[in-house]
Each structure stands twice: as C-alpha cells, then as structure tokens.
C-alpha cells in the first residue's frame, strides 16, 4: 500500500500495516523524490543557476525570430517540456538548455543575430552574456549530472509501465555514489547534495520493503560488480520475511539461498540471460 507523505496518511498507513500483517505500507517515492529535487533547487548556487537559465528560456520563447532560428537546427527538441513534477520540469529545462549550448552560442554570435534588433536591448545583452559565460555551462553540467539518476528514478516510480518497488533502493544508492564519484570523493563538495538525499531517505522513504525488493531483484542480485552488500539490505529482507511471511520462514530462507547462489532453476541459462530484460515480477 502506497500513500501520500502527509502525516495523517503516514499514521493511517502504519496502523493498517500493523493491524494486517500481510499488508506492507510505504510512503510515495515520487513525492519524496520531488521534495529532494525541491531541496536541491533551494541551494543558493542552484537557485542562481536556475534563475539565469530561466532568463534565457523566457527570452527565447518570447521572441519568435530567436525561437524560429533555433528550431531550424538538426534534431531540435523543445527546451520547455513537462515533467512528472514542478521541480522535475525545472531540471528538465536545465538539461535541455545544456543540450542546446552550442546552438545557443552559435545563434548569439551569428552576424544575422548581432545585426538584428533582437540583440540590442538590455535583456538581450544580459542573456547573451549568460550564454557566453563558460562558468554557467560548467555549473549546468554539474547539476544535470547530479539530478540525472534522480530524474531517471522519478520516471520509473511515477510511471505505470512496470512495478517500481524493486528499483527504489538501487536508484537512491546509485544517486549517492554518482554524486560522490563526480566530486572525486571530496566531502566538502558532495556533502550538500548527499545530505539532502540522506535526510529525505531516512526521514521519509526508507522502508525494509525497499531493501528486500532490491535484494530480490535479479537484475541487481546477479550483477556482483555493482550489487550493494550493506548489512541494511539483508536486514530489510529478513525483517520482511519475519514480519510478513505466512508460510514456513525456514523454507523461505532456504529459497533465498538458492536464488542468491543461482542454484536449481535459478541457475538456468534462460533465467540468467533474462534477469535484466524481464521485470522482476514476471521473472519470478
């Protein structure tokens, strides 16, 4: 059972889960991810970056000539595209803007634009200055890389194409590792971002069911190069078995060992070769 993250829903979900042992409650992952993106957008340097990006976007879409010139480019995609949430839309625009960096630079330095009336007013000059500012694009690149795994996870949990429970833990784990790697494990640089993820994850989203679903997802379990072996993962699985199982817990534990070690039917070539291309519920 998944509910909104409001305190009344949280209380109701816990009561139902405690009363009916076979029902597991979890807060809405999409809502939590939206709050994470919102927290990141409130960081001072990110807010300044978004403000500059918004100035470019508004200028482009408020001038038909400028927009028409850009749309002539090969493989053009709109800068403004709807996202699953308000904050997602902001970062999608930032990503799209970064994708069109060369198009924008080429436009504002072209003779046609420089000689046109669209380049003469104060706002146009401010926009051109931002577009030609290398630091702006460097900052864009960093933020886009930070939020990319979060945006990917948001699309999974907010969509209806596949059950998402088995991907939440891995998505959050990958996001934290990616941020640390990008900043070359320099704590002073990555901490503002990982702190946001940790606080939201610990306070709102962390549930044993996420760890259990991650452990039972063959796409991750059978990828030993990236599989997370933190004690909390196994602890989550054991807690779910202990609190929710209605059959023999000993048999369940025995089967988890067969699954982990790829024994019996779990070791068949068909099972192994399809573990990443087949949804966990279908694979099982």
Task: Specify the residue positions occupied by each region the protein language model found.
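Short alpha-helical patches at protein termini and domain edges
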Residues: 1-284
């Amino acid at each position: 059972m998944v509910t909104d993250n409001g305190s009344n829903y949280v209380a109701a979900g816990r009561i139902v889960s405690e009363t009916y042992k076979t029902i597991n409650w979890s807060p809405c992952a999409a809502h939590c991810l939206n709050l994470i993106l919102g927290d990141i957008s409130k960081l001072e340097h990110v807010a300044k970056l978004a403000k500059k990006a918004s100035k470019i976007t508004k200028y482009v879409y408020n001038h038909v000539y400028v927009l028409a010139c850009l749309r002539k480019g090969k493989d053009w995609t709109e800068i403004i595209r709807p996202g699953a949430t308000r904050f997602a839309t902001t970062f999608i625009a930032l990503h799209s803007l970064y994708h069109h960096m060369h198009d924008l630079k080429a436009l504002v330095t072209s003779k046609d634009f420089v000689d046109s009336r669209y380049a003469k007013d104060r706002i146009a000059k401010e926009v051109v200055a931002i577009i030609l500012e290398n630091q702006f694009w460097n900052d864009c690149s960093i933020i886009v890389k930070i939020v990319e795994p979060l945006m990917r996870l948001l699309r999974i949990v907010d969509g209806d194409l596949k059950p998402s429970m088995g991907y939440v833990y891995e998505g959050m784990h990958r996001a934290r590792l990616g941020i640390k790697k990008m900043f070359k494990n320099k704590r002073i640089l990555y901490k503002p971002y990982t702190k946001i993820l940790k606080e939201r994850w610990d306070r709102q989203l962390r549930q044993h069911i996420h760890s259990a679903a991650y452990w039972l997802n063959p796409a991750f379990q059978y990828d030993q190069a990236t599989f997370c072996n933190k004690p909390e993962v196994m602890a989550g699985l054991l807690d779910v078995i202990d609190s929710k199982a209605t059959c023999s817990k000993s048999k369940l534990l025995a089967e988890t060992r067969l699954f982990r070690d790829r024994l019996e039917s779990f070791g068949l070539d068909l099972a192994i070769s399809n573990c990443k291309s087949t949804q966990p519920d279908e694979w099982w």
